[in-house]
């Protein structure tokens, strides 16, 4: 199958993420929280490198995964409630809490939605744009809900030590707002990125028509 990215670009991106991973791990505020946050990055990067030849993704998807990985690693480094740039945004917008975790949850909807869309469209598993859009949003919300369950399990297992991982910042509606941000990310995919995504799929011969 035709590669969508040159091996040099893909390998350089993986190396960049590895270096960021090492740096954030060394300087992490809490090593256990960092490990829990970056584990998905480690798994996904290995998976993408292993499948780059037989199942290459669109450059758009690779780019968004790259950005999402950085967001996760920075969140793991400081813990989401203490990311410095989040405090700057909080002050600038006059918010009551650090909003960096909401950026993470937005991408948690955006990226899985695009992954789901790419798989569904390329595999021709579903006919009809509206049904594809609906299923893409369902997948993103399901992943978001699973992540919230993982946070709950972590809270039960770790007790007070899970506060940095949960990052609720005293917000009783944190779970609901997290999932809403994920939904916004998924809607961004189906409303604003779908056409460009389809053009890339056609350009690289990943779909026909």
From Swiss-Prot:
The chain crosses the membrane at residues 8-28, 32-52, 56-76, 132-152, 178-198. Signal peptide: none annotated. Keywords: Cell inner membrane, Cell membrane, Membrane, Transmembrane, Transmembrane helix. InterPro entries: UCP020606. Residues 29-31, 77-131, 199-209 are cytoplasmic. The keyword Cell inner membrane applies. It comes from the Bacteria. The keyword Cell inner membrane applies. It is a multi-pass membrane protein. Residues 1-7, 53-55, 153-177 are periplasmic. Its main location: membrane. One of its GO terms (cellular component) is plasma membrane. It is found in: Cell inner membrane. NCBIfam families: PRK09867.1. This is Inner membrane protein YjdF.
């Amino acid at each position: 199958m035709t590669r969508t990215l040159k091996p040099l670009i893909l390998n350089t991106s993986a190396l960049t993420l590895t270096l960021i991973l090492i740096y954030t791990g060394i300087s992490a505020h809490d090593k256990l929280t960092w490990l829990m946050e970056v584990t998905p990055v480690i798994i996904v990067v290995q998976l993408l490198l292993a499948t780059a030849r037989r199942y290459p993704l669109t450059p758009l998807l690779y780019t968004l995964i790259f950005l999402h990985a950085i967001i996760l690693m920075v969140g793991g480094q400081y813990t989401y409630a203490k990311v410095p740039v989040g405090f700057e945004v909080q002050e600038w917008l006059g918010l009551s809490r650090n909003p960096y975790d909401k950026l993470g949850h937005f991408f948690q909807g955006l990226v899985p939605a695009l992954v789901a869309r790419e798989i569904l469209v390329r595999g021709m598993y579903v006919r009809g744009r509206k049904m594809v859009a609906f299923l893409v949003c369902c997948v993103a919300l399901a992943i978001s809900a699973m992540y919230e369950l993982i946070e709950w399990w972590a809270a039960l297992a770790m007790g007070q030590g899970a506060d940095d991982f949960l990052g609720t910042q005293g917000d009783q509606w944190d779970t609901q707002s997290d999932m809403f941000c994920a939904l916004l990310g998924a809607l961004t995919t189906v409303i604003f990125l779908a056409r460009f995504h389809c053009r890339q799929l056609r350009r690289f011969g990943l779909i026909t028509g």
